[in-house]
Each structure stands twice: as C-alpha cells, then as structure tokens.
Design a protein with these regions (language model features):
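NAD(P)-binding Rossmann-fold cofactor-contacting core
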Residues: 10, 137-157
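Rossmann-like dinucleotide-binding domain for NAD(H)/NADP(H)
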Residues: 207-388
Length: 389
C-alpha cells in the first residue's frame, strides 16, 4: 500500500511506514501525479485536497493533522466514497500558549496590566476553552461568544455563574481585548468569513486590542487597517492572514505581532496531529495501532528555569518565564525578515518558515524554580501549565 504524507508532520515516516510504503512530500507542492497510485494521504492545511487532486487516483482515505478542514473538499469525498478525518484539539494548547505569550508581550511592551482587563473570546471550542482558562489565570475578566454552542447550551459544563455565553454586541461594547478562535465558515447563520469587518470594528470599544489566530479570512483586512488608522484598534496580533501565503505587507507593517500561521505549531501539537491521523488510518484499515510516539520524543529544550522574584511585579516575572520557553519576538522577527524578499520569494518564505519551524515545547515540560514569590504567582504559573518548585 502506498502512502503520501506532507512535510511538517513529525514522525510521519516512523508512524505510517508501519502500514505501507511511505513518501514525504512538500504539502503545497503535492500534485495529482503524486497521488495517482496512493491509497492513503496524510497532510496539513497547505494542501488543497479536492476533485482536481484526487479524481482518477486510488486514494481511499484522507487525513489532515489539523483542527481545520477548509482545505478539504468534503462534499467531493462523500461523492467519491473517500473516507477522511481531521485532528480536533491536537494543537489547542499550543494556540492558547501563543495567546498567553502575546498578551504578556503586549502588556509589558505597552505598560498596562492584564489583571482586571476584559477579554472577549469569540469561539469557545477546543482552543477557546483553553484561552478562557489561561486568561482567567492571569486575572482577566472573560466574555465568551459562541453562537453555535449558545444554541445548544445556556452554560458551560460546570454551570458556574461566570460561564454564560454573551452576544457579539456585548463583547464588542465591553472587551478591552478580543481574540478569535472560530472555524472558517463561508455561509449560513454562523458565517465567519469577514466576521471582523467594518461594522465589527465600528461597534468595538475604542482602543481595542485585536488578536486572530484562527483563519485569515475571518478578518476583512481593509476594515482592520481603517480601524487602526482611526484609533478604534490600538494593537493587533495576527498569526493568520487573508490570502496566505500571499499576505498583505501593508497589514503586516501595522501590527504589533506578525507570525506565519504557527500559533499551533508547538512540537507536541504537531506530534498529536500525526498521532491522531495515524490512529484513524489504522481504524480505517482494521489493524491495531501499534506505533507509539513516546519513544521518539526528545528531551525538553528548557527543562528548568530559575527565577529571582524579589522586587518585581508578577506580570514581569510571568513574561520572563514564558519568554524563556517561547520566543514569540523571534517568530515575529523571522517573519518580518522573510518579507524583505521579492514577491515570489516572500510567498515561498511563508511556507518555509512553517515547514522549518524551530522546535517549541509546551509549558508543561518546564519546571519553574521560584526564588521568592507569592502563593498567587505560583498558582498562576501552575494554571498556565508550568510545573513549579
């Protein structure tokens, strides 16, 4: 059996070669000729999988190691009898840590305190729920907006008083910060294409901090630029871009943090994407999933951090700890440097930065040894995912 896997799927060769002859190809470059004799296709979001790619091939199963599916033509799969899977939640913690790092970066750079700020989380699924938890750990007030879930349930699972969903108008009127974690939905009552449009920003609280680590087309780029120019929006974090990999340089030049769709690219997040697809392929084939990723996992890059707390604000200490584990500013710098190439090179560099992304480990693999520090600081670090001594 022939299998093709896209690059940027850690341990794909190790996992899928236990099932058949496996090749690794650059995701955006996979063509119909590459998959004509292939039965299993495992990939990420850079590969558009549709009739043009698959018609006339032997492909029986498509698995994407991502939480999104807008790159898959599912209606064609159903028509052609092709089974498929995705990896919901595989990188949810990674994205929530990216948002945490961004919040601390902005707060320390611009001199404001996160505690007491109101953050609106639009989309409270696998990612959004973790963002809510970490925002609360930082002492923020959280407004949750998720119309599909609100129709199904009036409260979150624990039925706590702080776990009610609110409508978008309330989020826009009250939130100091808004972060978006929705799927890309092109039509219907829950359409998210250009969710953040001119009306969205006009209704927002003046000086809004806006963050998008969902999908690029969720944001109307001209509307965002106008909101920045008019002072409606003060600071922006963008990890996803309209038209990516051919993103707009004028948008990049105006945002505080610009990264090339890597919020979910922690090593653990990518590995779990591979694992989830591998297990679904095994289920499809009716064979036991005997391969395990555990023996292949490398030691953490930053196993321990020792921090002197005396005389420093908790937020400054938190920023230092997070920065040592995840160099967000480095991601921003590399992306901006890559944009200096000519247009064709700039577009290629977007994919290159993603496929050759440096190893980033999640907070849970780092122990923080605090010299001093309050019980509150220790609790926050634990709630963010760190081990604390």
């Amino acid at each position: 059996m022939d299998i093709v896997c896209a690059t940027n799927m850690p341990f794909a060769m190790e996992a899928f070669s236990t099932l058949g002859s496996t090749r690794i190809l650059e995701g955006r470059d996979i063509k119909a000729a590459d998959v004509r004799e292939v039965e299993i296709l495992a990939l990420r979001s850079t590969t558009k999988v549709n009739r043009a790619l698959l018609e006339g091939s032997k492909v029986r199963f498509v698995g994407t190691a991502t939480i999104g599916t807008d790159h898959l033509d599912i209606s064609y799969f159903d028509q052609a009898g092709i089974k498929w899977c995705f990896a919901p939640g595989c990188n949810a913690n990674s994205v929530s840590e990216y948002i945490t790092a961004s919040l601390l970066f902005l707060a320390c750079k611009h001199g404001f305190t996160l505690e007491g700020k109101t953050i609106g989380v639009i989309g409270v699924g696998n990612v959004g729920r973790r963002v809510v938890q970490k925002a609360r750990a930082l002492g923020m007030q959280v407004l949750m907006n998720d119309p599909p879930r609100a129709r199904q349930e009036s409260r979150m699972e624990d039925n706590g008083p702080d776990d009610r969903f609110v409508d978008l108008d309330q989020v826009l009127a009250e939130a100091d910060i808004i972060t978006v974690h929705v799927p890309l939905t092109k039509e219907g009552p829950d359409k998210t294409v250009h969710l953040a449009d001119a009306s969205f920003f006009e209704r927002a609280k003046k000086g809004l901090i806006f963050m998008n680590a969902a999908r690029g087309p969720v944001v109307d780029s001209p509307a965002l630029l106008n909101a920045l120019a008019g002072g409606k929006v003060s600071h922006v974090v963008l990890d996803t871009w309209e038209g990516e990999p051919d993103y707009r340089l004028d948008v990049m030049s105006k945002v505080d943090i610009a990264t090339p769709h890597i919020a979910g690219h922690s090593f653990e997040g990518k590995v779990m994407g591979t694992v989830m697809v591998y297990r679904e392929v095994c289920r499809f084939l009716g064979v036991p999933a005997t391969w395990s990723h555990e023996p292949f996992m490398p030691a953490p890059l930053v196993p321990c951090i020792r921090v002197e707390v005396a005389g420093r604000q908790d937020q400054v200490v938190l920023r230092e700890v997070v920065r040592q584990v995840y160099d967000l500013a480095g991601d921003d710098r590399r992306f901006r440097d890559s944009a200096l190439a000519d247009n064709a090179g700039r577009i290629r560099n977007f994919d290159r930065l993603r496929s050759h992304y440096p190893e980033r480990r999640e907070f849970q693999y780092t122990t923080v040894k605090l010299i001093g520090g309050t019980p509150s600081l220790r609790r926050i670090l634990k709630d963010l995912g760190f081990k604390v001594e």
